[in-house]
Regions:
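Long, contiguous binding/interaction regions
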Residues: 1-58, 66-95
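S-adenosyl-L-methionine
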Residues: 63
Length: 95
């Protein structure tokens, strides 16, 4: 199995209910892409080195994932269309 790490920066001004809904959507998309969530690490709000979308901070979430194979194109396209996901980064973890 191949392992991956995925980090999100989410709009910090979202209410908890909205943020949980967005996180639920992200998890559903990961599952539909045959990615198994091994670990979810919520960092919470952290300051940026520079402003992103006029904000000095963002809400960080990091996932450790594994899968036999993954279609990243559709996931990245979907994440790019969500206005409250400000940044995301997929990394392939070498054993």
């Amino acid at each position: 199995m191949q392992k991956y790490e995925l980090m999100f920066i989410i709009n910090p001004s979202l209410q908890e209910e909205e943020r949980n809904k967005l996180i639920g959507e992200i998890k559903a998309e990961l599952k539909s892409a045959s990615l198994k969530i091994i670990n979810e690490d919520v960092w919470g709000e952290k300051d940026f080195a520079y402003k992103i979308k006029g904000s000095k901070n963002g809400y960080y979430i990091v996932y450790k994932l594994e899968s036999e194979r993954c279609e990243f194109f559709d996931l990245v396209k979907s994440f790019n269309l969500k206005k409250d996901i400000w940044r995301h980064l997929f990394l392939k973890i070498e054993d």
